[in-house]
Regions:
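HTH-adjacent hinge/linker in prokaryotic transcriptional regulators
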Residues: 2-99, 110-115, 119-120, 132-136
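A generic "binding-loop/recognition-motif" signal
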Residues: 104-105, 127
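Short glycine/serine/threonine-rich phosphate/pyrophosphate-binding segments
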Residues: 105-109, 212-215
Length: 265
């Protein structure tokens, strides 16, 4: 079996099962464990799965239970993220003071922003650099740097947030359910998200359809605390729900374009 064929089979098996061990993959594919480990290295580098001790985990499952690095997240559901961010970008007005959460979806939004008088604040180093490269006004909140996500976190971050009053804000999430609301896996991340959302007049959470119905470890806000903007294969129970906007490929909400700073419902 050629290496690329074996790796494709490994990626498919891990995707189907959510998690697989090196020994199980070796037995199923008739390859040595050392060969499987090398294949997992290649697949991890290609962002097709996440290599963990003793095996591998599907990206979607890993995203709910551990912090993926930003490169791991960039390739996930790119089309859906683009649709979400196109809609979100239309919400930013020239007089807004906008909070931008750390994460790949919100960073993608930053890359789509047009020149504006609006001011921005973020706890994401990478998002701050995107904004600065566009010549936009950006405040970088202090705190301890989390290398995997390039986010600033901790009490210094939440104290800085408490000084500001945001007119608009955008957050990411690992999962969202009606019962648990918006969830992440890290307490420090949840604390920063909650603190910023509490200081925001018009909060939006950006999450592609793969995160709907998924629950991570810690709730940072109930579902009704923010408008959810989503895209992709959205289940029927989420469509038409109050506070949920489904964006199409052109960045238009399911009930029409954004008007007067509020999304179509």
């Amino acid at each position: 079996v050629l290496a690329h064929e074996r790796q494709a089979r490994i990626a498919a098996l891990v995707g189907e099962r959510g998690v697989a061990t090196v020994s199980d993959l070796a037995a199923e594919l008739g390859a040595s464990e050392s060969t499987i480990r090398r294949d997992l290295d290649r697949l991890h580098e290609a962002h097709r799965l996440v290599k963990v001790h003793g095996g591998a985990m599907a990206l979607e499952r890993a995203h709910l239970t551990r912090d993926l690095t930003l490169p791991d997240r960039y390739g996930l559901h790119a089309g859906e993220k683009d649709a979400i961010c196109r809609l979100a970008a239309t919400l930013v007005g020239p007089d807004d003071f906008v909070y931008l959460d750390a994460g790949s979806t919100v960073e993608a939004l930053a890359s789509l922003l047009a020149p504006t008088r609006a001011a921005f604040a973020t706890n994401s180093v990478s998002t701050a650099l995107v904004l600065a490269a566009k010549g936009l006004r950006v405040i970088v909140l202090g705190g301890e740097l989390v290398d995997a996500t390039k986010a600033l976190s901790g009490p210094d971050t939440t104290e800085a947030i408490a000084r500001y009053n945001f007119t608009l804000g955008f957050w990411g999430t690992n999962g969202v359910t009606a019962e648990a609301g918006f969830t992440v896996q890290d307490r420090g991340e949840a604390a920063v998200k909650s603190a910023a959302l509490a200081r925001c007049a018009r909060p939006y959470v950006l999450a592609d359809a793969s995160k709907l119905g998924k629950r991570s470890l810690i709730t940072y806000a109930p579902l009704e605390a923010a408008t959810l903007v989503t895209a992709g294969d959205v289940p029927a129970q989420w469509r038409g729900r109050e506070g949920v906007v489904v964006a199409d490929a052109a960045g238009i909400g399911d009930n029409g374009p954004v008007e007067d700073g509020e999304p179509g419902r």
